[in-house]
Amino acid sequence: MKVKASIKADPSKGDILVRRSGRLYVINKKDPNRKQRQKGPARKK
């Protein structure tokens, strides 16, 4: 999974933007190597 400050999703390649627990993810079921996560707030202990 790539971790970037800014992520972009390309729906024509099957990317889906998902927000989970305050972080933004790009998931792709057709091509799992395209997974990305945006740097978000630090985890709570």
Curated annotation (Swiss-Prot):
Look up the signal peptide feature and give its range: none
Q: Name one GO cellular component term.
A: ribosome
Keyword flag Ribosomal protein: yes
Q: Where is the composition biased (Basic residues)?
A: 35-45
Kindly list the biological process annotations in GO that this record carries.
Answer: translation
Q: Where are the annotated coiled coils located? A: none
A single GO molecular function term of this UniProt record: structural constituent of ribosome
Chain segments carrying region Disordered: 26-45
* A family per Pfam: Ribosomal_L36
Q: Keywords assigned by UniProt?
A: Ribonucleoprotein, Ribosomal protein
Sorted alphabetically, which NCBIfam families does this protein's record hold?
Answer: rpmJ_bact (TIGR01022)
Task: Describe the family membership recorded for this protein in Swiss-Prot or TrEMBL.
Answer: Belongs to the bacterial ribosomal protein bL36 family.
Instruction: Supply the name of the protein.
Output: Large ribosomal subunit protein bL36
Per the UniProt record, the source organism is: Protochlamydia amoebophila (strain UWE25)
Q: Which gene encodes it?
A: rpmJ
